[in-house]
Amino acid sequence: MKRNLKAIPVLVAGLFTSQLSIAAGSVSADPHAGHDMSAMQMPADENFTEMTSMEPIVTESRTPIPPVTDADRKAAFGNLQGHAIHDSAINYLVLLDQLEWQRSDNTNNFSWSVNSWIGGDTDRIWLKSEGERSNGETEAAEAQLLWGHAVGPWWDLVAGVRQDFRPASARTWAAVGFQGLALYNFESEITGFVSNGGKAALRLGGEYDVLLTNRLILQPSYEVNFYSQDDESRGRGRGLTDTELGLRLRYEIRREFAPYIGVSWNQLYGKTSDMAKREGEKDHQVVFLAGARIWF
């Protein structure tokens, strides 16, 4: 019995070795051995000859294409009128930029500033007006009629006349200048004036819209005026006469209608300041504002 138990491991090892030999032989053997594959052979030479005898693909036109002439271009793109290309459309805008109540030194004033135009993209007619009323009387009023011509994508050359109605007697000025958008969409204008009496003046102005939200807009603005000669009747001295810095916060209920509140700082300089003091007036003011901006 002990002799038989010792022989069991030897038998197991022999069986395992024989199984490995059989498996190795089956892998190395041809899997298609014994099968006749002669009937499945393809006539490779004949097919290759047929494929190489095909005509090459034509990549160029056999008929030469004639060069394009001016007559061809004219026939392809007809002569469009201004209406067809929307190039000569006449548009207009009326902007009541400032219609406001002002409060300073226990005085209530009403002020206005209007800019309107009609024309196309290149040439426009501008009508501007601004003024101020206090205690039921018009203290200052002027109007400008200008022709504007675009001299670039962002700037217009303007020329025309300005008429002063108040203060003092009426006065007519010739006007020429530039207006447009400076860097970062800063609306700017510079205009020179020459009166029928030989006096000259220069006005600089600008404003910028800061969008706090899509409808809440903060607008800083400035205006600076210079005169070439003293003008006692209008209370203006030679040189830098006055500056105005404004800050208005408006809310666009609709794009065409926006009420606002704000404040402005007005300062007189030089002889203009001296003239105001002789009349018992201050040469500086802080003015609180409330009004509306309307356009159509």
From Swiss-Prot:
GO terms for molecular function: copper ion binding. InterPro entries: Cu-R_B_prcur. It comes from the Bacteria. One of its GO terms (cellular component) is cell outer membrane. It is found in: Cell outer membrane. Residues 1-23 form the signal peptide. It holds the Pfam family CopB. It is a peripheral membrane protein. The keyword Membrane applies. Keywords: Cell outer membrane, Copper, Membrane, Plasmid, Signal. GO terms for biological process: intracellular copper ion homeostasis. Required for the copper-inducible expression of copper resistance. This is Copper resistance protein B. It comes from Escherichia coli.
